[in-house]
Amino acid sequence: YPQGWLSENIEQGGQKQASWRTNPEIAGLSSCMGDIGTHCENLIEYITGLEITELCADLTTFVKGRGLDDDGSILLKLGKNTRGILWASQIAIGEENCLNIRVYGEKGSLEWHQKEPNTLLVHWLNKPTELKRTATPFVGKTSISNTRLPAGHPEGYIEAFANIYNNFANALSNKILKKTNKSTKYDYPNVDD
């Protein structure tokens, strides 16, 4: 998850977003990993369905005078003998919010880029790459039910939160009304996330 906006010591100039993120008294023990690395960690566990069991982290502060990390690489061990790599940086000059996700398996791999959020690449071992797009009949039922716009229109950040709130509201409503539907899985974060 590379970003470049903290490539200079802008917190010394009073930039509010940088000031609190790089201040240990406010941000805590980490800046880069605590800020954007946590998003990567959450996505890794959510997408794979596996928990991180061990890690080896190299957190670095490259910008002189900064009190917390601004770059980090982490080697991960997950359940089912799975390995992973997490890289988060706020000093990658030229990058905005370049979140990229790749999952590799025995028969293929998945590739997704935040800069092209409506596209999922499915690479196969012995077949051509498939390009999956939102709001098309070739994606799963859950994906279709969480899509608000026709194919070709970008789904946005706000819509993702709307899906979470909608799923939580539906689960809560069904609990209050004592409705049970075992076939419906409401996807929203809980205290364990």
Name what the model sees in each region.
Residues 35, 189-192:
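Residue-level signal for the nucleotide or nucleotide-sugar donor/cofactor binding architecture
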Residues 38, 87-95:
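Glycine-rich phosphate/pyrophosphate-binding beta-alpha loops
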Residues 63-66, 92-95, 111:
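Short glycine/serine/proline-enriched coil/turn segments at secondary-structure junctions
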Residues 67-71:
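A short, glycine/Asx- and small/polar-enriched loop/turn
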Residues 85-88, 112-113:
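Beta-strand scaffold of nucleotide-dependent catalytic cores
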